[in-house]
């Protein structure tokens, strides 16, 4: 919004004063700081209201370790605070002409709506398991397809007819492998592959949100990682490099994305603004969600954040790399898949309880220790993902 205002008045005296708004780096930092301050400002009032509205509700699932019963009475649906701060920071500082920004907002808020329905059913019908899994999957698929529709445009065939095409690149990039070596094009099959990434990530974050602060810090780390990846893939910055021309070395300016051997992402800098808003909103929520938590994010937060991270993986062309970035989330959902498959096939359980963080709880590990160790692993995963930029 502020960027559009700057474009309108850029040739005036006021426009020269607001010249800093044209720099993505400023708007990235500003979006994060604004989302953080907004969350810290309205967080206490929102939590107090949630506690009042949910008085007498347990908000603790029955299929969790007995130690979780002490968390009864802690309000849920705190993810509404995260979504509000993300939307405000993005709308205020991103370039709203970018279609990618609107697609990410739609995907995030759409998945947040699904989470809201799930939380509301659990609260309104005590001991309810919320929205049925099949209905949840249908709604997740619906909002994903709406996002894909937002990325469609038309092109003209040689015979003059029109056909749809995706605005995003349908080629895949692999970590540690330059695109010039291996860069398969999935064509329209890419839509199905992206669906697995987006819906899978959303559900993985949802499964991870079982301990105080466990899901939000890996989300923050992932958002920071994606901010870097989006910025370098979308920036117009170039790097001095040598090129051999006619047997002689010549100094040339090589675009940063080309130098790093990754795909270009048009509008990547604006996606970085969105990432920064997630970081700011996440830090403000962590202030209230750290052990012992004053509020839980609920499905309204976990499904939305997972959808956002999956969407960023898709739009930044890091679908495969996201398996590294989301290492903790991937491990959590994988543990559930292993547990279910093992029990159905052999009648035996691999873990004491799934997702895997409950396994460590039942082994006697203290909740804060599990949380911090998972945070450390998440940071390492983000570092490895960024390292893959250079090792190509």
UniProtKB/Swiss-Prot annotation:
Transmembrane segments: 28-48, 76-96, 101-121, 137-157, 181-201, 213-233, 268-288, 295-315, 320-340, 369-389
Cellular compartment(s): Cell inner membrane
EC number(s) recorded for this UniProt protein: 2.7.8.13
Keywords carried by this UniProt record: Cell cycle, Cell division, Cell inner membrane, Cell membrane, Cell shape, Cell wall biogenesis/degradation, Magnesium, Membrane, Metal-binding, Peptidoglycan synthesis, Transferase, Transmembrane, Transmembrane helix
Cofactors (names): Mg(2+)
Catalytic activity: UDP-N-acetyl-alpha-D-muramoyl-L-alanyl-gamma-D-glutamyl-meso-2,6-diaminopimeloyl-D-alanyl-D-alanine + di-trans,octa-cis-undecaprenyl phosphate = di-trans,octa-cis-undecaprenyl diphospho-N-acetyl-alpha-D-muramoyl-L-alanyl-D-glutamyl-meso-2,6-diaminopimeloyl-D-alanyl-D-alanine + UMP
GO molecular function: metal ion binding; phospho-N-acetylmuramoyl-pentapeptide-transferase activity; UDP-N-acetylmuramoyl-L-alanyl-D-glutamyl-meso-2,6-diaminopimelyl-D-alanyl-D-alanine:undecaprenyl-phosphate transferase activity
Main localization (coarse): membrane
InterPro entries with a match to the protein in the record: Glycosyl_transferase_4, PNAcMuramoyl-5peptid_Trfase, PNAcMuramoyl-5peptid_Trfase_CS
Metabolic or biological pathway, per its Swiss-Prot or TrEMBL entry: Cell wall biogenesis; peptidoglycan biosynthesis
One GO term (biological process): cell division
Pfam families: Glycos_transf_4, MraY_sig1
Protein role: Catalyzes the initial step of the lipid cycle reactions in the biosynthesis of the cell wall peptidoglycan: transfers peptidoglycan precursor phospho-MurNAc-pentapeptide from UDP-MurNAc-pentapeptide onto the lipid carrier undecaprenyl phosphate, yielding undecaprenyl-pyrophosphoryl-MurNAc-pentapeptide, known as lipid I.
HAMAP family attached to this UniProt entry: MraY (MF_00038)
Name assigned to this protein: Phospho-N-acetylmuramoyl-pentapeptide-transferase
Protein's organism: Myxococcus xanthus (strain DK1622)
Chain's gene name: mraY
